[in-house]
Amino acid sequence: MDGDRSKRDSYWSTSPGGSTTKLVSDSERSGKVDTWLLILAFTQWALSIATVIICIVIAARQGYSMERYSMTVEALNTSNKEVKESLTSLIRQEVITRAVNIQSSVQTGIPVLLNKNSRDVIQLIEKSCNRQELTQLCDSTIAVHHAEGIAPLEPHSFWRCPAGEPYLSSDPEVSLLPGPSLLSGSTTISGCVRLPSLSIGEAIYAYSSNLITQGCADIGKSYQVLQLGYISLNSDMFPDLNPVVSHTYDINDNRKSCSVVATGTRGYQLCSMPTVDERTDYSSDGIEDLVLDILDLKGRTKSHRYSNSEIDLDHPFSALYPSVGSGIATEGSLIFLGYGGLTTPLQGDTKCRIQGCQQVSQDTCNEALKITWLGGKQVVSVLIQVNDYLSERPRIRVTTVPITQNYLGAEGRLLKLGDQVYIYTRSSGWHSQLQIGVLDVSHPLTISWTPHEALSRPGNEDCNWYNTCPKECISGVYTDAYPLSPDAANVATVTLYANTSRVNPTIMYSNTTNIINMLRIKDVKLEAAYTTTSCITHFGKGYCFHIIEINQKSLNTLQPMLFKTSIPKLCKAES
């Protein structure tokens, strides 16, 4: 074993080249490692110190930058504040300056310029309107017109159906339509407003009423109020009367029994100007003065007064009055219905009914036209024709309705609807039933009355609701009707539905034999007087305005009130 170890030691101690190799001991190797570890540790320490120094330097520099940044931001804020304050001050000064200028212009400059321009335009228009050929142009300077689709109801157009036959329906019952009423009233407790007259033209309407300041006596001094306006639709899409201009005529002129016509952009009013009471007037020869008033939409008014000698009368009259209800406009003339007493009675046979009446003859009917209470004068209806009504001085001609065509002369109304003229007269005599028909104004003048059995009016005991036999009497009340069908067989009206008393005003839609649909205004005891009904269409749908003199019983005075209904027309399907 020892020999082998000596051989092994000899091998490791000699190099292959034969030189001797010195072996490194374990202690020597350990010393070198420690040296390198020491060097590495020192290097790490040095790097750490350098890193700390670098961080300190960087931090110092950053602190300086932050301080400079803060100072810069503060300086910018200060500068921004100064600029803001400067701009605000400048803007405030500019705004104040401009506001002062605007205020000055609005309060002073613009009104002055507008007034000047308005005066210039008005002067130019008035200068132009003085020329005859520009009259129509000047009339149209104010654009006032009914709402689109609204027109006076024309029976030939209304009373038809796309299929089937038209008829008045009882279901549902008519009801009052909501909306305002702007009819003129009184400012005194005892004031009385009478004789409403309404005319609806193609563009505007005219409404007139008589205001007596104390009580309701006809001869009492009174104002006459004439309104012009147009028909609009309210928020419920129902029609309303909207007055545009109103004129009140002097109380000292004492206009009475006025009738109106609306045509173009003007309203025309024909009135009597009595100086005595009615009975005294009938007992004397000649008539009281008439006056024609003209009002336009600018509020300008003109009046023409006519004495008995200035009127072309076809017969001598002791009394003559416009008929309260509306008149009509035709080519170049206005026509008002009137009534009055002839100085000398006409000869001929009047409208009469003998069948079913005891001890009655034609003479009974003829004599019934001569009213004892009015001095025995024969009371007739007339047409009052105002010719050349656009001229400086219109002319008036009076034509008597032949007694052969008429009942007792009385208040009434004319309507021109389409090509036909309709006439209504108050049933003041023995004939109590509704008097409405078609008037032919050509020569000879004729009336085709439509017999109505269902509608009548209250009257005195001898001539009450049911009376149909001839006798002398003067009674009744003005309750006109509006024709819905071309033959005036179907009508809209407000009747005082009572036998002898002026009570129970009731809106009625009726044909010749039956009351189809009706609405009582309040109750059977409500007192009323004159009523007038006018109807329109809105794109074919029919509506009626009803104006009723209602007795304000707590004040014992009359005041017209406006009501509106929808026409209950339906179409019967063909079988």
Curated annotation (Swiss-Prot):
Highest taxon, organism lineage: Viruses
Segments on the Intravirion face: 1-37
Extent of Polar residues compositional bias: 11-24
Region (Involved in interaction with F protein): 59-140
Domain topic, free-text comment: The C-terminus (head domain) is involved in binding the cellular receptor.
Entry protein name: Hemagglutinin-neuraminidase
GO (cellular component) term, any one: membrane
Region listing for Incorporation in virion, in residue ranges: 10-14
Biased composition (Basic and acidic residues): 1-10
Main location: virion
Subcellular location: Virion membrane; Host cell membrane
Membrane-protein topology: Single-pass type II membrane protein
Transmembrane stretches, start-end: 38-58
Disulphide bonds in the chain: C192-C216, C258-C271, C357-C469, C463-C473, C535-C544
Listed result of changing E461G: In strain: Isolate E30cl2; egg passage attenuated
Region annotation (Disordered) ranges: 1-25
